[in-house]
């Protein structure tokens, strides 16, 4: 089994200072180290439950990574790892964005220390104000022919306008590191719009969240992916995926109103960009 | 002639010489402008809302009509004080059952004082606000067997957990809310919550607006539910009505939807929907 570090991680843990990070193989699988304390356990428990939950409709299942159980991996000192579908294996030049959903990342079952840590982070970011925050993104620059990633510290301090700008840059073709030029949002309708675009997928997810009471997806992210190789021909292969289930708890008959509120807010941001880019192109 | 409203279930009450709202016999509700910024903020909201052309007509009906600020003899004897003159949403009802539900998984909002934040978050965590996205603030329900009202104490209501909130919502549409040892009969669930003019239909209309409106953030606002119990007239309609109230903490939306209110509203809708569905199943099974 030939394992290496994934190329396009935009958020979450990476292999650093001797601590294990995620790995990918050449068969389309993603190996995530089981996090210490209860988080790894909770994530496994979620995947086990979800993969055998017959009440999850098939069209919703596509928004979740396929689960392949757990495995001890030699190159990580026999550490146990969760084996998942590598969401990027079928992409050759993916642009990826990680958006943490919900107006709070803490939840009643968490420890007081964790709750306070989350409250601080939520207040400093757009989580409280907008119901979501951008954890990270990487976008392909079609002029520079390379990937660009914003500075992590910069991202942590952005406000609502910064979020809008990031969502525009994410679907732009012009030079991204040049802050003086306005992002052209050239790919907005291919990526965000259309019958298979991001907006359509998010709306499908939203309908499920209005009724499902199985899980509360605390601190989960939505990953947005699209292909740059084919985008110039209008073929974005845009995909929405939910990831990071270390804090998921039972819904206990209550909908995940925290995730739903944030998702609805995010949908509005995406829709606004799509509409303003549509308006722009009709004016040109 | 002004008097203390009969059907207040939450908020300040003008009792025992305290300052509180008053009603007249013309269907107007007078709410004293609170000393701090809150009264000013509420008046500012009503001024803005009543003249905001971007609010659709069908949504306007969910808000009390605004009749400006008027000088009125205060309930605590302190003389003429400015009061918000509003539509009295329960006038015209003979024996109304009323419930006040505070919507949102948080009652605080960005940029409040640390003191206010701590007060709010403590209450939010102790009640169902954090867990359900809403909490019951108060209610009074007419009991058809006892011919009187069930009006649980405020402390009891604030101690509700998920099951308590669900039971209160069931009792709200029951004919026997005072009977403790008996299961609430949900006798009026389909007439009050269900139907083409019922509470659920109205909540869904509100929800559609909240999915895209970025005009206001309704921090700490309540939904009031009212319906008629008077049976002196045969087949009297229940006239179930939803109204949004309490706008002391409303802020500009600034281009962002009120995701806090929206999430809580969806959770509340799910609870109501479940009660309607289980009461329909009850009838089918001949209970």
Regions found by a protein language model. Give the residues of each.
Chain A
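Polybasic, positively charged surfaces/segments
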Residues: 1-284
């Amino acid at each position: 089994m030939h394992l290496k570090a994934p190329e396009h991680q935009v958020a979450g843990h990476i292999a650093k200072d001797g601590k294990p990070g995620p790995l990918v193989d050449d068969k389309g699988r993603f190996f995530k180290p089981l996090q210490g304390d209860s988080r790894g356990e909770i994530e496994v428990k979620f995947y086990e439950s979800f993969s055998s939950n017959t009440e999850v409709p098939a069209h919703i299942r596509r928004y979740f990574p396929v689960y392949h159980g757990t495995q001890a991996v030699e190159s990580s000192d026999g550490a146990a790892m969760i084996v998942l579908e590598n969401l990027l294996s079928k992409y050759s030049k993916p642009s990826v964005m990680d958006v943490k959903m919900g107006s709070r990342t803490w939840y009643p079952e968490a420890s007081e220390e964790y709750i306070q840590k989350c409250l601080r982070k939520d207040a400093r970011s757009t989580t409280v104000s907008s119901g979501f925050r951008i954890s990270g993104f990487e976008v392909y620059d079609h002029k520079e022919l390379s990937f660009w990633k914003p500075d992590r510290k910069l991202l942590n301090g952005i406000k609502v306008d910064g979020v809008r700008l990031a969502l525009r840059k994410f679907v732009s073709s012009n030079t991204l590191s040049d802050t003086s030029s306005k992002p052209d949002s050239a790919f907005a309708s291919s990526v965000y719009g259309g019958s298979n675009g991001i907006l359509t997928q998010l709306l499908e997810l939203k309908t499920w969240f209005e009724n499902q009471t199985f899980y509360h997806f605390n601190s989960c992210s939505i990953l947005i992916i699209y292909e740059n190789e084919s985008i110039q021909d209008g073929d974005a292969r845009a995909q929405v995926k939910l990831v990071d289930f270390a804090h998921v708890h039972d819904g206990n008959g209550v909908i995940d109103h925290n995730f739903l509120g944030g998702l609805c807010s995010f949908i509005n941001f995406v829709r606004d960009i799509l509409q303003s880019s549509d308006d722009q192109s009709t004016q040109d | 002639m002004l008097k203390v409203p009969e059907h207040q279930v939450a908020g300040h009450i003008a009792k025992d010489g305290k300052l509180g709202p008053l009603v007249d016999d013309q269907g107007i509700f007078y709410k004293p402008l609170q000393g701090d910024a809150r009264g000013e903020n509420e008046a500012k909201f009503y001024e803005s809302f009543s003249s905001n052309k971007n609010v659709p007509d069908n949504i306007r009906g969910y808000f009390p009509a605004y009749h400006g600020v008027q000088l009125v003899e205060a309930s605590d004897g302190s003389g003429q004080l400015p009061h918000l003159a509003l539509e009295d949403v329960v006038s015209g009802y003979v024996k109304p059952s009323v419930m006040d539900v505070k919507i949102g998984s948080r009652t605080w909002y960005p940029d409040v004082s640390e003191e206010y934040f701590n007060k709010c978050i403590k209450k939010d965590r102790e009640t169902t606000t954090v867990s359900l996205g809403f909490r019951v603030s108060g209610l009074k329900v007419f009991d058809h067997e006892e011919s009187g009202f069930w009006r649980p104490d405020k402390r009891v209501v604030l101690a509700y957990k998920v099951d308590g909130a669900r039971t209160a919502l069931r009792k709200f549409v029951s004919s026997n809310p005072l009977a403790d040892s008996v299961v609430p009969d949900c006798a009026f669930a389909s007439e009050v919550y269900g139907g083409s003019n019922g509470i659920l239909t109205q909540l869904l209309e509100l929800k559609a607006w909240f999915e895209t409106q970025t005009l206001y953030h309704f921090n700490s606002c309540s939904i009031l539910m009212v319906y008629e119990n008077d049976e002196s007239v045969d087949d009297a309609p229940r006239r179930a009505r939803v109204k949004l109230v309490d706008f002391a903490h409303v802020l500009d939306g600034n281009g962002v939807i009120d995701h806090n209110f929206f999430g809580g509203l969806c959770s509340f809708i799910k609870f109501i929907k479940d009660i309607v569905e289980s009461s329909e199943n009850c009838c089918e099974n001949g209970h």
